[in-house]
Amino acid sequence: MVNSEQALHQHDPAPILQLDKVSKSFGPVNVINQVSIDVRPGRVLALLGENGAGKSTLIKMMSGVYQPDGGQILVDGKPTTLPDTKTAESFGIATIHQELNLVPTMTVAENVMLGRTPRKWGLVNFKHLRRQAQAALDLIGVDVDLNAQVGSLGIARQQMVEIAKALSMNARILILDEPTAALTGREIDQLFKVVDQLKEKGVAMVFISHHLDEIARIGDTVSVLRDGQFIAELPADTDEDELVRLMVGRSIENQYPRSAPEIGQPLLEVKNLNAEGRFTDISLTVRAGEVVGLAGLVGAGRTEVVRSIAGVDKVDSGEVIVAGKKLRGGDISEAIKNGIGHIPEDRKAQGLVLGSSVEDNLGLATLASTARAGLVDRSGQHKRAAEVAEKLRIRMASLKQPISDLSGGNQQKAVFGRWVLAGSNVLLLDEPTRGVDVGAKVEIYNIINEMTEKGGAVLMVSSELPEVLGMADRILVMSGGRIAGELPAKGTTQDDVMALAVSQVDDSITEEAAAEIENTKEDR
């Protein structure tokens, strides 16, 4: 009798990379437990799981960064040891990370051939270098100026350079780790065209994404992990609700569980805020118990407004008032002292100190205010951090663990925890669920609910319109650096939001913004 996995692959070629019952532990923590994965030529295997499920550890074993404690890795059916990334590359295994491995000050051609520069008589043979780099770019059909500095390119183009670099090393297996995280809809379309081309050439691919629609669109099969365990391998077009159930171990009945707290007095008031070249005449109010969404296209000025309210950036004129008190502009410590907490759009670059512990990151906003006689109250800080970490269910080995070791969802909960610890009653959220899985998103929404139920106020920027419509009470829509209008979340459609979002946009609309408009049309 043919089992379901055999039926799934009965017409597929034999795998070129296999993980056979591999396990991996870090100290007492068992991260991967007897997981088996097959990667096949000309196929895309999507790897799905919550943050912390073990996806990153698994791909690091595939690429030679980690070695399994148990089980074995097979390449072309033969047991193989991958002690380092160079060995993995020699077998044709290449990884495209979220943080691209390129040198910004070097040219496209030099980056494609990085570490393998052709030489003649001891000197770089630039003619040969450009020829080889062009051949690699031709494989994916991308037209990029070979002499352009990589740092001058957008993220999508840099990603194509990274893929070309992998192919120039004769990669047979491409591991794509969250490749769409920083891309617009149009750029994602271009990436997926390249993936389709590579499939036709017989390249095997492992694709990691939190976006279930992308998995159905580009994957052939999907392997689901949960808590380091292999749960199932299924066709990539499996119903999304079923994938979520397998991934989190339960059904999520309400993806946007907005509570209905009593709306109180204004907590945050912004009056006639202006910053030349960024935004004009911004006025808004957020009341106690309320979530106000801030929507708009890329470049509309949403992030700039939030940063200015938080005191990160200075403004030319206008007022920010919290609980009746006018704040000094451009003063972060003043904003924090008066109850403002800011969660930036890029948590790794702006929201965390990656080299520090979970405990230190949780306490960043309160170290000074809780000091005694000028000395940090380490004991008290540890106790408070432990309470917040438990309350927010931050998954970690200990408070002393480097925050860089945590999954994206747990890192984001730690940033929230910092402001819970600080007692902030006004939260400014910029893309609060970017790069986190479905289960972690719901946990973050519940944190937002709990804060508003206690009388807090939330101003939330999000590029995901379903999130704005599902979690906000009111929606302010920005267009061309101005607030173009206000909509009640109840009964409002994505069409309604987009109509306001493009109302002030002129002929200089960015490519990213145009892509957002097209994507919204497609979603409908």
Curated annotation (Swiss-Prot):
Please state where this protein is localized.
Answer: Cell membrane
Q: Gene3D superfamilies from the xrefs?
A: P-loop containing nucleotide triphosphate hydrolases
Q: Which GO terms describe its molecular function?
A: ABC-type D-ribose transporter activity; ATP binding; ATP hydrolysis activity
Domain ABC transporter: start-end pairs: 17-252, 263-505
**EC number, UniProt record:** 7.5.2.7
Question: Keywords in UniProt for this one?
Answer: ATP-binding, Cell membrane, Membrane, Nucleotide-binding, Repeat, Sugar transport, Translocase, Transport
**What's its top-level EC category?**
translocase
Q: Which residues bind ATP?
A: 49-56
Family listed? Belongs to the ABC transporter superfamily. Ribose importer (TC 3.A.1.2.1) family.
Its recorded name reads Ribose import ATP-binding protein RbsA
Taxonomic lineage of the native organism: Bacteria, Bacillati, Actinomycetota, Actinomycetes, Mycobacteriales
